[in-house]
Amino acid sequence: MIEYIQTYMVADEYRGQFELSFGPGGAWSRLFARSPGFYGATLLRNADEPRRYVVIEVWEDRTQRKAALAASQREYDDFLPSLERWIESRQELGTFTRLAEAGVRPQRKPRRR
């Protein structure tokens, strides 16, 4: 499994549109929704700089991501002009392999006697 990570700096006036497009059921996820190997995308907004976002796509492997991009090229090309208008900068952080995942168990409430 791989995670493809990008950061975006979005103009204030387009933050809502960006969030809708990259959020659940948005244009970005719809590009890949039926693609083999696509597990989903996560949209994060920086708590200190609300114009800065991180998008994390989760895929089975690089080959399936590349194939999905090729298969969705027309839709991507249609989406690109809007994206370019909304963003001030974009940086690809890269493709990462998940090595480990840690979680915190929920605390149990003390039982009443």
Predicted ranges, named:
Residues Q17, G23-Y39, V58-G94:
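An amphipathic, aromatic/His-enriched active-site/gating alpha helix that lines ligand/cofactor pockets
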Residues I2, Y39-R52, D77-R113:
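Glycine-rich beta-strand-turn "strand-cap" elements at beta-sheet edges
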Residues E13, D48-P50, T63:
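Short alpha-helical
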